[in-house]
């Protein structure tokens, strides 16, 4: 799997973005071809698909966690399906307590604390496991652009700072698809931020299905210490912003590629950097779980989703998905 950082030209167009446009056109054509030839299957349960239009972290994992807690509180049986990014997974599997991030993906390990999770790289492989588990609801993390299964309810997650970047498709820009169709057909749109940002103009036509959501800390961290932050997630800038908004003194930071699998040498280098800054290492839950087999003394900041209008979420999901029917 190719792991890339989010390049600057994905946010603001420059000569590199324009030079890559011909490849983006090929990407667009292949996407249209794939969609036109696909014959979507009907999964044996209602499907809630959480996805985004662009590469990089937009808060999908936190949205799935929120949905899982909501359904569990309503005593609704559900299964989460996750894409197993950054793992060596060969076939679809139900995650158990002993699985590692390298085996099933970092997101799968985290989400398994909230319910039954199937990790897969091919959506078609989940059917036997779904038939065995017999859930009422299937929450699918990502796969928004996958045309091979029917979606009953779609949630599009949008990062409030990056939005849709420079507006170009991969690799000239960050977009997996142009946002117009995704936003028009979405049942809900989550505008995710680390602060209470204003609604951007591009989303004002969708105000009736827009939910403002904030990523907020859910664990206590000693605010008297200095911290050196690092992360290998899709949107590290939002993590660093969350740390500062929480009132932590961040003396430095290091960014790794998304879904990065850390080595002992990386850990030693990070400890050296922290010592230079007279600081304690701090990172995300997605990164922290990858140090299970390495001696470490790294602080983990857990985060969760806070939304401004939960009634809209409840009304839309329980009405459209017809959970109790």
Swiss-Prot record:
GO terms for biological process: lipid A biosynthetic process; lipopolysaccharide core region biosynthetic process. GO terms for molecular function: ATP binding; tetraacyldisaccharide 4'-kinase activity. GO terms for cellular component: plasma membrane. Its EC number is 2.7.1.130. The keyword Protein transport does not apply. Pathway: Glycolipid biosynthesis; lipid IV(A) biosynthesis; lipid IV(A) from (3R)-3-hydroxytetradecanoyl-[acyl-carrier-protein] and UDP-N-acetyl-alpha-D-glucosamine: step 6/6. InterPro entries: LpxK, P-loop_NTPase. Transmembrane segments: none annotated. SUPFAM superfamilies: P-loop containing nucleoside triphosphate hydrolases. ATP binds at residues 54-61. It is an enzyme of class 2 (transferase). It comes from the Bacteria. It catalyses: a lipid A disaccharide + ATP = a lipid IVA + ADP + H(+). Keywords: ATP-binding, Kinase, Lipid A biosynthesis, Lipid biosynthesis, Lipid metabolism, Nucleotide-binding, Transferase. Belongs to the LpxK family. HAMAP family: LpxK. Transfers the gamma-phosphate of ATP to the 4'-position of a tetraacyldisaccharide 1-phosphate intermediate (termed DS-1-P) to form tetraacyldisaccharide 1,4'-bis-phosphate (lipid IVA). This is Tetraacyldisaccharide 4'-kinase. It comes from Rickettsia felis (strain ATCC VR-1525 / URRWXCal2).
